[in-house]
From Swiss-Prot:
Gene Ontology, cellular component aspect: cytosol
Organism: Dictyostelium discoideum (Social amoeba)
Annotated residues for binding of ATP: G16, P17, S18, G19, V20, G21, K22, G23
Any one Gene Ontology molecular-function term assigned to this protein's record: guanylate kinase activity
Descriptive protein name: Guanylate kinase
Catalyzed reactions per annotation: GMP + ATP = GDP + ADP
Length: 202
């Protein structure tokens, strides 16, 4: 796929195992290109972590409410991760698109499968750790997981990294070993979208 060929602001989906640095990379993009991205706020049934704000980091909801929304077809993708539901609503996608902003989604591999099945054109990017052991060290170092949740996240990470090696499943794979190097790779993929969006707003 030609990185320089962009003729529409299709959503950009960034995925990868928990702890790989997806959020950090997205935050850097949003700071450098302030105003270009309309980061979509996903829904989740998990409890907020310290410092997380409802409507900013996630729309925090409960299982009955989210289950009803899924049944009604309100979500373009949803997944059950570590016993909690996550999902992206159609309304959130439309809100960003209507403002001529670039949609950037941080979703898991299950969510990617749902989007692919729905035939929604997207740019799929996988952020990979250099090794599984590195990821394990990062998760332990984060200090936010107990033994049970750490085990679950590592089991999920192993499954997700299998998808990384499926030919054609992702448009790009970026190894996040050195953050600035990984960010440089991500910028080179995203820059045609930034250029297209800037021209569209003129």
């Amino acid at each position: 796929m030609d990185n320089n060929s962009v003729d529409s602001l299709i959503p950009i989906i960034i995925t990868g195992p928990s702890g790989v640095g997806k959020g950090t990379l997205i935050d850097k993009l949003r700071k450098e290109y302030e105003g270009s991205f309309g980061h979509i706020v996903s829904h989740t049934t998990r409890k907020p972590r310290e410092g997380e704000i409802n409507g900013v980091h996630y729309h925090f909801t409960d299982i009955p409410t989210m289950t009803e929304g899924i049944k009604n077809g309100d979500f373009i993708e949803h997944a059950n991760v570590h016993g909690n539901f996550y999902g992206t609503s159609k309304k959130a996608l439309k809100d960003v698109s209507d403002k001529n902003k670039i949609c950037i989604l941080d979703i898991d591999v299950q969510g990617c499968e749902s989007v692919k099945k729905a035939n929604i054109p997207c740019k799929f990017i996988f952020i990979s750790p250099p090794t599984f052991e590195t990821l394990q060290e990062r998760l332990i170092g984060r200090g936010t997981e107990n033994e049970e949740t750490l085990k679950k996240r590592l089991e999920t990470a192993k499954k997700e990294m299998v998808y990384r090696d499926i030919p054609g499943f992702f448009d790009h794979v970026i190894v996040n070993n050195v953050l600035d190097v990984a960010y440089g790779e991500l910028k080179s993929i995203i820059s045609p979208f930034i250029s297209f969006q800037s021209k569209s707003n003129k």
